[in-house]
Amino acid sequence: MKYNGPCADTAGSAGEGLRKKGGTPMRKRNKVVSLLLAGCMAAGLLAGCGSSGEAQVATADNATAASTSTGAADSAAPETAGEVDGQINLRTVSFGNNFDVQDMGWRWMMAECYEGLMRDVADENGDRFEYAGAESMDVSDDGLVYTFHLRKDAKWSDGQPVTAADYEYGWKRLLNPEYGYSYSFYLFNVVGAEEYYNGQGSADEIGIKAVDDYTFEVTLKVADPTFQSKLVATPLYPTRQDVAEAAGDQWGKDWTKCVYNGPFAMTNLVEDNSMTWVKNDQYWDKDNVKLNQVNWYCVAENATAATMFDNGQLDVFDAAGDYIAKYDKEVEAGNMQTMTTEYPGTMVLCYEQSEGGKSGLMKNVNIRKAISYSINREEMVSAVYGRYTAAYGFVSPAITLDGTSYRKQASETMKEEYEQYAGDADKLKALFQKGLDELGITDKPEDITITLLSQGSATENQLEREYLQQSISQNLGVKVELNTVGDYQMFANERDNKNYDIFVGGWFSDYNDPLDFLNVMKTGVYDSYGLYSNSEYDSLIDSLTGENDNAKRLEIYQKLEDLLVAQDCGVAPLYYSDKHYYYQNWVKDFYTSSFGASQELYRATVEK
Protein backbone atom coordinates (compact mmCIF):
# COMPACT_ATOMS: atom_id res chain seq x y z
CA MET A 1 0.00 0.00 0.00
CA LYS A 2 1.52 3.24 -1.01
CA TYR A 3 1.30 6.47 0.88
CA ASN A 4 2.68 9.61 -0.71
CA GLY A 5 2.27 12.46 1.69
CA PRO A 6 3.87 14.25 4.55
CA CYS A 7 3.10 11.63 7.12
CA ALA A 8 0.94 8.65 7.76
CA ASP A 9 -1.02 6.90 10.39
CA THR A 10 0.42 3.47 10.74
CA ALA A 11 -0.12 0.40 12.83
CA GLY A 12 0.39 -3.25 13.33
CA SER A 13 2.85 -6.09 13.37
CA ALA A 14 3.76 -8.98 11.17
CA GLY A 15 4.75 -11.88 13.30
CA GLU A 16 6.80 -10.07 15.96
CA GLY A 17 4.07 -10.19 18.57
CA LEU A 18 2.64 -7.30 20.55
CA ARG A 19 2.85 -5.78 23.97
CA LYS A 20 -0.14 -4.82 26.06
CA LYS A 21 -0.80 -3.94 29.65
CA GLY A 22 -3.29 -2.45 32.06
CA GLY A 23 -7.04 -2.47 32.46
CA THR A 24 -9.27 -5.38 31.61
CA PRO A 25 -7.52 -8.26 29.79
CA MET A 26 -8.03 -8.16 26.04
CA ARG A 27 -7.13 -10.37 23.12
CA LYS A 28 -5.50 -8.36 20.40
CA ARG A 29 -4.29 -8.39 16.89
CA ASN A 30 -1.41 -6.39 15.60
CA LYS A 31 -2.01 -4.49 12.43
CA VAL A 32 -2.15 -1.66 10.06
CA VAL A 33 -4.37 1.34 9.82
CA SER A 34 -2.62 3.24 7.10
CA LEU A 35 -3.86 6.57 5.88
CA LEU A 36 -3.51 6.58 2.15
CA LEU A 37 -5.31 9.81 1.48
CA ALA A 38 -4.84 11.95 4.54
CA GLY A 39 -1.71 12.91 6.32
CA CYS A 40 -1.85 12.77 10.04
CA MET A 41 1.16 11.19 11.65
CA ALA A 42 -0.40 9.68 14.71
CA ALA A 43 -3.99 10.30 14.00
CA GLY A 44 -5.60 7.13 12.81
CA LEU A 45 -8.08 4.92 14.25
CA LEU A 46 -10.05 5.57 17.38
CA ALA A 47 -12.83 3.34 18.53
CA GLY A 48 -15.62 3.97 20.97
CA CYS A 49 -19.14 3.06 21.82
CA GLY A 50 -22.05 5.42 21.82
CA SER A 51 -24.83 6.71 19.62
CA SER A 52 -28.27 5.40 20.42
CA GLY A 53 -30.79 3.98 18.04
CA GLU A 54 -31.71 0.58 16.68
CA ALA A 55 -29.39 -0.91 14.07
CA GLN A 56 -30.99 -1.74 10.73
CA VAL A 57 -30.23 -4.71 8.54
CA ALA A 58 -28.11 -3.77 5.54
CA THR A 59 -29.48 -4.70 2.15
CA ALA A 60 -29.15 -3.12 -1.26
CA ASP A 61 -32.61 -1.58 -0.80
CA ASN A 62 -32.28 0.01 2.61
CA ALA A 63 -28.71 1.14 1.95
CA THR A 64 -30.07 3.51 -0.66
CA ALA A 65 -32.78 4.72 1.66
CA ALA A 66 -30.31 5.29 4.45
CA SER A 67 -28.18 7.50 2.25
CA THR A 68 -30.81 10.19 2.45
CA SER A 69 -30.87 10.27 6.24
CA THR A 70 -28.27 13.00 6.55
CA GLY A 71 -29.06 15.83 8.90
CA ALA A 72 -28.04 17.46 12.12
CA ALA A 73 -27.96 14.15 13.94
CA ASP A 74 -25.42 12.80 11.47
CA SER A 75 -22.93 15.56 12.08
CA ALA A 76 -23.19 15.48 15.87
CA ALA A 77 -20.36 14.17 18.00
CA PRO A 78 -20.81 10.63 19.34
CA GLU A 79 -22.55 10.17 22.64
CA THR A 80 -20.53 9.25 25.69
CA ALA A 81 -18.80 5.97 24.96
CA GLY A 82 -20.13 2.95 26.76
CA GLU A 83 -23.72 4.23 26.96
CA VAL A 84 -24.91 1.75 24.35
CA ASP A 85 -23.84 -1.87 24.13
CA GLY A 86 -23.18 -3.24 20.67
CA GLN A 87 -22.14 0.06 19.09
CA ILE A 88 -18.63 1.32 18.58
CA ASN A 89 -17.35 4.73 17.50
CA LEU A 90 -14.17 4.98 15.45
CA ARG A 91 -12.11 8.02 14.61
CA THR A 92 -10.23 8.60 11.38
CA VAL A 93 -8.79 11.66 9.68
CA SER A 94 -10.27 10.96 6.25
CA PHE A 95 -12.75 8.82 4.38
CA GLY A 96 -11.32 7.24 1.27
CA ASN A 97 -14.44 7.96 -0.81
CA ASN A 98 -13.66 4.99 -3.02
CA PHE A 99 -15.77 1.86 -2.70
CA ASP A 100 -14.24 -0.24 -5.49
CA VAL A 101 -12.36 -3.09 -3.80
CA GLN A 102 -10.05 -3.54 -6.78
CA ASP A 103 -8.94 0.06 -6.22
CA MET A 104 -8.97 -0.07 -2.44
CA GLY A 105 -5.41 0.85 -1.59
CA TRP A 106 -6.97 2.64 1.40
CA ARG A 107 -7.88 -0.77 2.83
CA TRP A 108 -7.64 0.55 6.38
CA MET A 109 -11.34 1.21 6.41
CA MET A 110 -13.92 -0.26 4.05
CA ALA A 111 -12.25 -3.67 3.84
CA GLU A 112 -14.26 -4.81 6.87
CA CYS A 113 -17.41 -4.56 4.76
CA TYR A 114 -15.93 -7.04 2.30
CA GLU A 115 -14.16 -10.38 2.48
CA GLY A 116 -11.71 -12.29 0.30
CA LEU A 117 -10.64 -15.91 0.12
CA MET A 118 -8.55 -15.62 3.28
CA ARG A 119 -8.04 -13.17 6.11
CA ASP A 120 -5.05 -12.23 8.23
CA VAL A 121 -5.49 -12.89 11.94
CA ALA A 122 -3.07 -11.86 14.66
CA ASP A 123 -2.78 -12.29 18.39
CA GLU A 124 -0.02 -12.38 20.99
CA ASN A 125 1.69 -15.14 18.99
CA GLY A 126 1.86 -13.17 15.75
CA ASP A 127 0.01 -13.19 12.44
CA ARG A 128 -1.52 -16.17 10.72
CA PHE A 129 -3.87 -16.73 7.80
CA GLU A 130 -7.23 -18.41 8.07
CA TYR A 131 -9.91 -19.21 5.55
CA ALA A 132 -12.68 -16.67 5.01
CA GLY A 133 -14.55 -16.76 1.69
CA ALA A 134 -12.87 -20.09 0.95
CA GLU A 135 -13.27 -23.23 3.05
CA SER A 136 -10.19 -24.98 1.70
CA MET A 137 -7.48 -24.79 -0.94
CA ASP A 138 -5.60 -27.35 -3.03
CA VAL A 139 -2.19 -26.66 -4.58
CA SER A 140 -0.74 -28.79 -7.36
CA ASP A 141 2.57 -30.56 -6.77
CA ASP A 142 4.40 -28.13 -9.05
CA GLY A 143 2.95 -25.14 -7.17
CA LEU A 144 1.29 -23.72 -10.29
CA VAL A 145 -2.42 -24.48 -9.88
CA TYR A 146 -4.43 -23.23 -6.90
CA THR A 147 -7.96 -24.54 -6.47
CA PHE A 148 -10.18 -22.78 -3.94
CA HIS A 149 -13.33 -24.39 -2.57
CA LEU A 150 -15.72 -21.60 -1.59
CA ARG A 151 -18.21 -21.43 1.25
CA LYS A 152 -21.68 -22.28 0.01
CA ASP A 153 -23.27 -20.21 2.77
CA ALA A 154 -21.48 -16.97 1.82
CA LYS A 155 -23.89 -14.27 0.60
CA TRP A 156 -23.91 -10.67 -0.46
CA SER A 157 -25.86 -8.17 1.61
CA ASP A 158 -28.77 -8.38 -0.85
CA GLY A 159 -29.05 -12.14 -0.25
CA GLN A 160 -27.41 -13.30 -3.49
CA PRO A 161 -24.78 -16.05 -3.14
CA VAL A 162 -21.07 -15.25 -3.41
CA THR A 163 -19.82 -17.49 -6.22
CA ALA A 164 -16.59 -18.30 -8.02
CA ALA A 165 -17.82 -16.11 -10.88
CA ASP A 166 -17.59 -13.09 -8.55
CA TYR A 167 -13.93 -13.84 -7.87
CA GLU A 168 -13.23 -14.45 -11.54
CA TYR A 169 -14.85 -11.16 -12.51
CA GLY A 170 -13.12 -9.21 -9.75
CA TRP A 171 -9.66 -10.58 -10.54
CA LYS A 172 -10.04 -10.10 -14.28
CA ARG A 173 -11.41 -6.62 -13.70
CA LEU A 174 -8.23 -5.86 -11.75
CA LEU A 175 -6.27 -6.76 -14.90
CA ASN A 176 -8.52 -4.92 -17.35
CA PRO A 177 -6.35 -2.21 -18.99
CA GLU A 178 -9.44 -0.04 -19.37
CA TYR A 179 -9.43 0.63 -15.63
CA GLY A 180 -5.69 0.91 -15.04
CA TYR A 181 -5.75 -0.40 -11.46
CA SER A 182 -2.45 0.20 -9.67
CA TYR A 183 -2.51 -3.26 -8.06
CA SER A 184 -2.87 -5.15 -11.34
CA PHE A 185 0.77 -6.27 -11.07
CA TYR A 186 -0.24 -8.52 -8.17
CA LEU A 187 -1.56 -10.98 -10.74
CA PHE A 188 1.09 -10.67 -13.45
CA ASN A 189 2.41 -14.15 -12.60
CA VAL A 190 -0.97 -15.64 -13.52
CA VAL A 191 -0.99 -17.24 -16.97
CA GLY A 192 -2.03 -14.67 -19.59
CA ALA A 193 -2.53 -11.88 -17.03
CA GLU A 194 0.27 -9.47 -17.93
CA GLU A 195 -0.35 -10.03 -21.63
CA TYR A 196 -4.01 -9.09 -21.23
CA TYR A 197 -3.13 -6.01 -19.18
CA ASN A 198 -0.69 -4.91 -21.88
CA GLY A 199 -3.27 -5.37 -24.63
CA GLN A 200 -1.64 -8.48 -26.08
CA GLY A 201 -4.17 -11.10 -25.05
CA SER A 202 -7.79 -11.67 -24.12
CA ALA A 203 -9.54 -12.15 -20.80
CA ASP A 204 -10.45 -15.69 -21.85
CA GLU A 205 -6.76 -16.61 -21.99
CA ILE A 206 -6.10 -15.66 -18.36
CA GLY A 207 -5.51 -18.54 -15.95
CA ILE A 208 -8.37 -17.43 -13.71
CA LYS A 209 -11.66 -19.30 -13.95
CA ALA A 210 -14.79 -20.35 -12.13
CA VAL A 211 -14.85 -24.14 -12.55
CA ASP A 212 -18.34 -24.17 -11.06
CA ASP A 213 -20.30 -21.97 -8.66
CA TYR A 214 -18.09 -22.84 -5.69
CA THR A 215 -14.76 -23.84 -7.24
CA PHE A 216 -12.29 -21.13 -8.22
CA GLU A 217 -9.06 -22.02 -10.04
CA VAL A 218 -5.91 -19.96 -10.62
CA THR A 219 -2.93 -21.06 -12.74
CA LEU A 220 0.46 -19.39 -12.30
CA LYS A 221 3.30 -19.12 -14.82
CA VAL A 222 5.92 -20.09 -12.23
CA ALA A 223 5.67 -21.16 -8.61
CA ASP A 224 5.52 -18.12 -6.35
CA PRO A 225 6.26 -18.28 -2.59
CA THR A 226 4.48 -14.94 -2.07
CA PHE A 227 1.19 -15.85 -3.78
CA GLN A 228 -0.65 -17.14 -0.72
CA SER A 229 0.34 -14.02 1.23
CA LYS A 230 -1.34 -11.88 -1.42
CA LEU A 231 -4.70 -13.61 -0.98
CA VAL A 232 -5.66 -11.35 1.94
CA ALA A 233 -5.13 -8.17 -0.12
CA THR A 234 -8.29 -6.18 -0.80
CA PRO A 235 -7.75 -5.92 -4.60
CA LEU A 236 -8.27 -9.70 -4.72
CA TYR A 237 -11.72 -9.53 -3.13
CA PRO A 238 -14.72 -10.58 -5.25
CA THR A 239 -16.90 -8.16 -7.22
CA ARG A 240 -20.44 -8.73 -8.47
CA GLN A 241 -20.50 -8.19 -12.23
CA ASP A 242 -24.19 -7.31 -12.44
CA VAL A 243 -23.87 -4.69 -9.68
CA ALA A 244 -20.68 -3.13 -11.03
CA GLU A 245 -22.00 -2.92 -14.57
CA ALA A 246 -25.33 -1.49 -13.44
CA ALA A 247 -23.46 1.28 -11.61
CA GLY A 248 -21.48 2.15 -14.74
CA ASP A 249 -19.09 5.05 -14.25
CA GLN A 250 -20.45 5.53 -10.72
CA TRP A 251 -18.97 2.22 -9.60
CA GLY A 252 -16.67 2.89 -6.70
CA LYS A 253 -17.92 6.46 -6.39
CA ASP A 254 -21.51 6.01 -5.24
CA TRP A 255 -21.64 3.80 -2.16
CA THR A 256 -25.41 3.33 -2.46
CA LYS A 257 -24.80 1.14 -5.52
CA CYS A 258 -22.60 -1.32 -3.58
CA VAL A 259 -23.34 -4.69 -2.05
CA TYR A 260 -21.18 -6.21 0.67
CA ASN A 261 -20.05 -9.73 1.57
CA GLY A 262 -18.24 -8.91 4.82
CA PRO A 263 -19.34 -8.71 8.46
CA PHE A 264 -20.70 -5.16 8.05
CA ALA A 265 -22.56 -3.12 5.46
CA MET A 266 -22.49 0.62 4.97
CA THR A 267 -25.78 2.44 5.49
CA ASN A 268 -24.89 6.12 5.71
CA LEU A 269 -22.21 8.60 4.69
CA VAL A 270 -21.81 12.30 5.36
CA GLU A 271 -18.65 13.21 3.48
CA ASP A 272 -15.78 14.41 5.65
CA ASN A 273 -17.99 13.98 8.70
CA SER A 274 -19.41 10.56 9.53
CA MET A 275 -20.01 7.07 8.21
CA THR A 276 -22.23 4.30 9.55
CA TRP A 277 -22.05 0.53 9.13
CA VAL A 278 -24.46 -2.05 10.51
CA LYS A 279 -24.09 -5.75 11.04
CA ASN A 280 -24.63 -7.61 7.76
CA ASP A 281 -27.37 -10.12 8.52
CA GLN A 282 -26.48 -12.05 5.35
CA TYR A 283 -22.88 -12.67 6.46
CA TRP A 284 -22.09 -16.38 6.76
CA ASP A 285 -20.61 -15.98 10.27
CA LYS A 286 -23.07 -13.36 11.51
CA ASP A 287 -23.76 -15.24 14.75
CA ASN A 288 -20.21 -14.50 15.89
CA VAL A 289 -20.34 -10.81 14.97
CA LYS A 290 -21.05 -9.04 18.26
CA LEU A 291 -21.38 -5.41 17.18
CA ASN A 292 -24.67 -4.14 15.81
CA GLN A 293 -23.34 -0.83 14.52
CA VAL A 294 -20.05 0.89 13.71
CA ASN A 295 -19.92 4.69 13.65
CA TRP A 296 -16.99 6.47 12.04
CA TYR A 297 -16.19 10.12 12.76
CA CYS A 298 -13.79 12.27 10.79
CA VAL A 299 -11.58 14.13 13.30
CA ALA A 300 -8.48 15.67 11.76
CA GLU A 301 -6.71 17.05 14.81
CA ASN A 302 -5.12 14.82 17.43
CA ALA A 303 -5.85 17.39 20.13
CA THR A 304 -9.56 17.27 19.33
CA ALA A 305 -9.56 13.48 19.25
CA ALA A 306 -7.70 13.35 22.57
CA THR A 307 -10.32 15.57 24.17
CA MET A 308 -13.06 13.30 22.85
CA PHE A 309 -11.15 10.31 24.18
CA ASP A 310 -10.79 11.97 27.59
CA ASN A 311 -14.52 12.73 27.60
CA GLY A 312 -15.41 9.13 26.81
CA GLN A 313 -16.72 9.92 23.34
CA LEU A 314 -14.01 7.78 21.78
CA ASP A 315 -12.60 4.57 23.13
CA VAL A 316 -9.27 4.11 21.38
CA PHE A 317 -6.53 6.66 20.84
CA ASP A 318 -3.44 6.16 18.70
CA ALA A 319 -1.05 8.38 20.62
CA ALA A 320 2.17 10.21 19.90
CA GLY A 321 4.31 12.79 21.64
CA ASP A 322 3.19 14.06 25.04
CA TYR A 323 0.01 11.97 24.94
CA ILE A 324 2.02 8.80 25.53
CA ALA A 325 3.30 9.92 28.93
CA LYS A 326 -0.13 11.24 29.85
CA TYR A 327 -1.98 8.02 29.07
CA ASP A 328 0.71 5.74 30.47
CA LYS A 329 -0.20 7.17 33.86
CA GLU A 330 -3.85 6.29 33.24
CA VAL A 331 -2.84 2.75 32.32
CA GLU A 332 -0.80 2.39 35.50
CA ALA A 333 -3.83 3.57 37.47
CA GLY A 334 -5.94 0.86 35.81
CA ASN A 335 -8.16 3.38 34.03
CA MET A 336 -7.43 2.12 30.51
CA GLN A 337 -5.37 -0.34 28.52
CA THR A 338 -2.51 0.05 26.08
CA MET A 339 -0.97 -1.95 23.27
CA THR A 340 2.14 -1.28 21.21
CA THR A 341 2.65 -3.10 17.93
CA GLU A 342 4.95 -2.97 14.97
CA TYR A 343 3.47 -2.20 11.58
CA PRO A 344 4.93 -3.17 8.19
CA GLY A 345 5.45 0.39 6.98
CA THR A 346 8.44 2.64 6.36
CA MET A 347 8.42 6.39 5.85
CA VAL A 348 11.03 7.74 3.44
CA LEU A 349 12.23 10.96 1.86
CA CYS A 350 11.57 10.89 -1.88
CA TYR A 351 13.54 12.85 -4.48
CA GLU A 352 12.38 14.03 -7.93
CA GLN A 353 14.98 12.11 -9.93
CA SER A 354 13.60 12.15 -13.46
CA GLU A 355 14.28 15.84 -14.12
CA GLY A 356 16.17 16.80 -10.98
CA GLY A 357 13.29 18.59 -9.29
CA LYS A 358 12.64 22.32 -9.14
CA SER A 359 16.28 22.92 -8.20
CA GLY A 360 17.59 20.66 -10.95
CA LEU A 361 19.87 18.94 -8.42
CA MET A 362 18.09 15.73 -7.42
CA LYS A 363 19.56 13.55 -10.18
CA ASN A 364 22.91 13.63 -8.41
CA VAL A 365 23.53 10.88 -5.86
CA ASN A 366 25.82 12.98 -3.66
CA ILE A 367 23.22 15.73 -3.45
CA ARG A 368 20.65 13.15 -2.39
CA LYS A 369 23.02 11.62 0.15
CA ALA A 370 23.93 15.01 1.61
CA ILE A 371 20.25 15.78 2.15
CA SER A 372 19.61 12.35 3.66
CA TYR A 373 22.62 12.41 5.98
CA SER A 374 21.71 15.88 7.25
CA ILE A 375 18.66 14.37 9.00
CA ASN A 376 19.16 12.95 12.49
CA ARG A 377 16.63 10.10 12.52
CA GLU A 378 16.95 9.34 16.22
CA GLU A 379 16.33 12.96 17.15
CA MET A 380 13.50 13.25 14.65
CA VAL A 381 11.45 10.33 15.98
CA SER A 382 11.95 11.56 19.54
CA ALA A 383 11.37 15.28 19.06
CA VAL A 384 8.63 15.18 16.44
CA TYR A 385 6.66 12.01 17.20
CA GLY A 386 7.74 10.61 20.55
CA ARG A 387 7.50 7.13 19.00
CA TYR A 388 8.56 5.08 15.95
CA THR A 389 12.00 3.64 15.21
CA ALA A 390 14.72 5.39 13.23
CA ALA A 391 15.15 3.69 9.85
CA TYR A 392 18.29 3.07 7.82
CA GLY A 393 16.71 0.47 5.54
CA PHE A 394 13.61 0.33 3.34
CA VAL A 395 12.07 -2.99 4.42
CA SER A 396 10.22 -2.81 7.74
CA PRO A 397 11.31 -4.99 10.71
CA ALA A 398 7.71 -6.22 10.81
CA ILE A 399 8.26 -8.12 7.55
CA THR A 400 9.43 -11.70 8.01
CA LEU A 401 11.22 -14.24 5.85
CA ASP A 402 11.13 -17.86 6.94
CA GLY A 403 9.43 -16.77 10.15
CA THR A 404 12.18 -14.35 11.23
CA SER A 405 12.19 -10.57 10.93
CA TYR A 406 13.94 -9.55 7.72
CA ARG A 407 15.82 -6.85 9.60
CA LYS A 408 17.39 -9.49 11.85
CA GLN A 409 18.78 -11.16 8.73
CA ALA A 410 19.75 -8.10 6.67
CA SER A 411 21.94 -5.26 7.91
CA GLU A 412 21.09 -1.61 7.28
CA THR A 413 24.06 -0.93 5.01
CA MET A 414 23.30 2.78 4.67
CA LYS A 415 24.08 3.35 8.33
CA GLU A 416 27.85 2.91 8.03
CA GLU A 417 28.27 5.80 5.59
CA TYR A 418 25.58 7.86 7.31
CA GLU A 419 27.53 7.76 10.58
CA GLN A 420 30.60 9.18 8.83
CA TYR A 421 28.66 12.37 8.06
CA ALA A 422 25.96 12.61 10.72
CA GLY A 423 26.24 15.73 12.86
CA ASP A 424 29.26 17.06 10.95
CA ALA A 425 28.08 20.12 9.00
CA ASP A 426 31.48 20.62 7.35
CA LYS A 427 31.52 17.09 5.92
CA LEU A 428 27.90 17.39 4.82
CA LYS A 429 28.54 20.68 3.06
CA ALA A 430 31.58 19.16 1.34
CA LEU A 431 29.47 16.22 0.14
CA PHE A 432 26.82 18.61 -1.15
CA GLN A 433 29.49 20.70 -2.88
CA LYS A 434 30.87 17.56 -4.51
CA GLY A 435 27.44 16.99 -6.02
CA LEU A 436 27.27 20.58 -7.27
CA ASP A 437 30.69 20.20 -8.89
CA GLU A 438 29.63 16.99 -10.61
CA LEU A 439 26.60 18.81 -12.02
CA GLY A 440 28.68 21.79 -13.09
CA ILE A 441 26.72 24.09 -10.79
CA THR A 442 28.67 27.19 -9.75
CA ASP A 443 26.00 28.70 -7.49
CA LYS A 444 26.87 29.02 -3.83
CA PRO A 445 24.81 26.83 -1.46
CA GLU A 446 23.21 29.89 0.15
CA ASP A 447 21.82 30.84 -3.27
CA ILE A 448 20.24 27.43 -3.81
CA THR A 449 16.61 26.66 -2.88
CA ILE A 450 15.31 23.14 -2.28
CA THR A 451 11.52 22.73 -2.31
CA LEU A 452 9.88 20.44 0.25
CA LEU A 453 6.36 19.46 -0.82
CA SER A 454 3.99 18.66 2.05
CA GLN A 455 0.34 18.52 3.04
CA GLY A 456 -1.56 18.46 6.32
CA SER A 457 -2.33 20.96 9.07
CA ALA A 458 -2.09 18.72 12.13
CA THR A 459 0.58 19.52 14.69
CA GLU A 460 2.67 16.51 13.69
CA ASN A 461 2.59 17.59 10.04
CA GLN A 462 3.87 21.03 10.94
CA LEU A 463 6.57 19.71 13.26
CA GLU A 464 7.76 17.25 10.63
CA ARG A 465 8.25 19.75 7.82
CA GLU A 466 9.80 22.32 10.16
CA TYR A 467 12.27 19.75 11.46
CA LEU A 468 13.27 18.71 7.94
CA GLN A 469 13.52 22.32 6.81
CA GLN A 470 15.77 23.26 9.72
CA SER A 471 17.97 20.15 9.51
CA ILE A 472 18.68 20.44 5.80
CA SER A 473 19.11 24.20 5.84
CA GLN A 474 21.47 24.30 8.81
CA ASN A 475 23.63 21.37 7.76
CA LEU A 476 23.95 22.21 4.06
CA GLY A 477 23.68 25.99 4.09
CA VAL A 478 20.85 26.02 1.53
CA LYS A 479 17.38 27.51 1.61
CA VAL A 480 14.51 25.07 2.06
CA GLU A 481 11.19 26.35 0.76
CA LEU A 482 7.99 24.75 2.03
CA ASN A 483 5.35 24.09 -0.60
CA THR A 484 2.46 23.17 1.72
CA VAL A 485 -0.86 22.39 0.06
CA GLY A 486 -4.32 21.99 1.54
CA ASP A 487 -5.35 18.45 0.68
CA TYR A 488 -4.14 15.17 -0.78
CA GLN A 489 -5.41 15.83 -4.30
CA MET A 490 -3.50 19.09 -4.45
CA PHE A 491 -0.46 17.28 -3.10
CA ALA A 492 -0.77 14.58 -5.76
CA ASN A 493 -1.11 17.19 -8.50
CA GLU A 494 2.03 19.01 -7.36
CA ARG A 495 3.88 15.71 -7.09
CA ASP A 496 2.77 14.47 -10.50
CA ASN A 497 3.68 17.82 -12.05
CA LYS A 498 7.14 17.46 -10.47
CA ASN A 499 6.76 20.75 -8.65
CA TYR A 500 9.08 19.72 -5.82
CA ASP A 501 12.54 18.50 -4.94
CA ILE A 502 11.70 16.30 -1.96
CA PHE A 503 8.67 15.02 -0.05
CA VAL A 504 7.96 12.46 2.66
CA GLY A 505 6.14 9.34 1.50
CA GLY A 506 5.93 5.75 2.61
CA TRP A 507 5.13 2.17 1.78
CA PHE A 508 2.87 0.00 3.91
CA SER A 509 3.08 -3.63 2.92
CA ASP A 510 0.13 -5.60 1.57
CA TYR A 511 1.70 -9.01 2.07
CA ASN A 512 4.40 -10.49 4.26
CA ASP A 513 7.50 -10.62 2.11
CA PRO A 514 10.36 -8.14 1.49
CA LEU A 515 9.45 -8.21 -2.19
CA ASP A 516 6.36 -6.09 -1.56
CA PHE A 517 8.65 -3.26 -0.48
CA LEU A 518 11.44 -3.72 -2.97
CA ASN A 519 9.29 -4.34 -6.04
CA VAL A 520 7.65 -0.91 -5.85
CA MET A 521 10.98 0.72 -6.72
CA LYS A 522 11.35 -1.21 -9.97
CA THR A 523 11.18 1.06 -13.00
CA GLY A 524 7.58 1.76 -13.98
CA VAL A 525 5.87 -0.07 -11.11
CA TYR A 526 5.12 3.09 -9.12
CA ASP A 527 6.06 6.44 -10.57
CA SER A 528 5.10 8.36 -7.44
CA TYR A 529 8.30 7.69 -5.50
CA GLY A 530 10.49 10.18 -7.31
CA LEU A 531 10.87 8.08 -10.48
CA TYR A 532 13.89 6.11 -9.28
CA SER A 533 15.22 3.91 -12.07
CA ASN A 534 18.20 1.57 -12.22
CA SER A 535 18.56 -1.25 -14.77
CA GLU A 536 20.68 -3.34 -12.37
CA TYR A 537 17.94 -3.03 -9.75
CA ASP A 538 15.29 -4.05 -12.30
CA SER A 539 17.32 -7.11 -13.32
CA LEU A 540 17.68 -8.21 -9.71
CA ILE A 541 13.91 -7.95 -9.24
CA ASP A 542 13.36 -10.02 -12.38
CA SER A 543 15.79 -12.68 -11.12
CA LEU A 544 13.41 -13.42 -8.24
CA THR A 545 10.78 -14.81 -10.61
CA GLY A 546 10.59 -18.55 -10.05
CA GLU A 547 13.15 -18.47 -7.23
CA ASN A 548 11.71 -20.40 -4.29
CA ASP A 549 14.86 -20.85 -2.21
CA ASN A 550 14.51 -18.36 0.65
CA ALA A 551 18.26 -18.27 1.26
CA LYS A 552 18.81 -17.14 -2.32
CA ARG A 553 15.90 -14.73 -2.12
CA LEU A 554 17.40 -13.19 1.01
CA GLU A 555 20.71 -12.67 -0.79
CA ILE A 556 18.95 -10.89 -3.65
CA TYR A 557 16.84 -8.81 -1.27
CA GLN A 558 19.99 -7.63 0.51
CA LYS A 559 21.58 -6.61 -2.80
CA LEU A 560 18.44 -4.74 -3.82
CA GLU A 561 18.15 -2.82 -0.58
CA ASP A 562 21.84 -1.93 -0.54
CA LEU A 563 21.63 -0.65 -4.11
CA LEU A 564 18.45 1.34 -3.48
CA VAL A 565 19.29 2.89 -0.12
CA ALA A 566 23.06 2.82 0.42
CA GLN A 567 24.52 3.15 -3.08
CA ASP A 568 21.92 5.14 -5.04
CA CYS A 569 20.02 6.84 -2.21
CA GLY A 570 16.96 6.34 -4.40
CA VAL A 571 14.91 7.00 -1.27
CA ALA A 572 16.11 8.07 2.18
CA PRO A 573 14.56 5.96 4.97
CA LEU A 574 13.34 8.03 7.92
CA TYR A 575 11.51 5.75 10.35
CA TYR A 576 9.75 2.41 10.75
CA SER A 577 6.09 2.71 11.70
CA ASP A 578 4.20 1.28 14.64
CA LYS A 579 0.92 1.56 16.50
CA HIS A 580 0.56 2.78 20.06
CA TYR A 581 -3.05 2.33 21.14
CA TYR A 582 -4.79 3.31 24.35
CA TYR A 583 -8.16 1.66 25.07
CA GLN A 584 -11.01 2.31 27.43
CA ASN A 585 -11.65 -0.74 29.59
CA TRP A 586 -15.08 -1.48 28.18
CA VAL A 587 -13.87 -2.33 24.66
CA LYS A 588 -13.08 -6.02 24.28
CA ASP A 589 -11.54 -8.06 21.46
CA PHE A 590 -10.75 -5.14 19.20
CA TYR A 591 -8.22 -6.62 16.79
CA THR A 592 -5.77 -5.17 14.33
CA SER A 593 -3.99 -7.28 11.74
CA SER A 594 -0.94 -6.71 9.59
CA PHE A 595 -2.27 -7.43 6.12
CA GLY A 596 -5.57 -7.31 4.27
CA ALA A 597 -8.23 -5.43 6.24
CA SER A 598 -6.56 -3.01 8.61
CA GLN A 599 -8.97 -3.34 11.50
CA GLU A 600 -10.94 -6.44 12.39
CA LEU A 601 -14.16 -5.48 14.14
CA TYR A 602 -16.04 -8.69 13.58
CA ARG A 603 -15.15 -10.06 17.03
CA ALA A 604 -15.13 -6.78 18.96
CA THR A 605 -17.59 -6.14 21.78
CA VAL A 606 -18.62 -3.09 23.78
CA GLU A 607 -19.82 -3.64 27.34
CA LYS A 608 -20.78 -0.95 29.82
Where are these regions (language model features)?
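Ligand/substrate-recognition segments at binding pockets and active sites
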Residues: 271, 422-509, 579
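Structural transition elements
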Residues: 389-435, 457-461
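Detector for C-terminal structural segments
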Residues: 372-407, 460-470, 493-608
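Ligand-site clamp/hinge motif
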Residues: 249, 282-328
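Surface-exposed binding/hinge segments that line
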Residues: 168, 182-242
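Gly/Pro-rich hinge or "lid" segments in bacterial periplasmic/extracellular proteins
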Residues: 122-124, 213, 220-289, 293
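N-terminal lobe/hinge region of extracytoplasmic solute-binding protein
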Residues: 91-141, 259
